[in-house]
Swiss-Prot record:
Fe cation binds at residues 6, 9, 39, 42. This is Rubredoxin-1. Pathway: Hydrocarbon metabolism; alkane degradation. The gene is rubA1. The keyword Transcription regulation does not apply.
Length: 55
């Protein structure tokens, strides 16, 4: 599972955790997140997220 970070506000989407508040179940891969999904903190789209490594 990977993590993706919003380049605008820094929010991190963790594929292992998903985003249940937004209707995205745990284990949902980034490519399976709907294309029209927006960052819940700043409102940008998926194109403004970059894959990151944490650790």
């Amino acid at each position: 599972m990977k993590k993706w970070q919003c380049v605008v506000c820094g929010l991190i989407y963790d594929e292992a955790k998903g985003w249940p508040e937004e209707g995205i179940e745990a284990g949902t891969r980034w490519e399976d997140v709907p294309e029209d999904w927006l960052c819940p903190d700043c409102g940008v789209g998926k194109l403004d997220f970059e894959m990151i490594e944490i650790g």
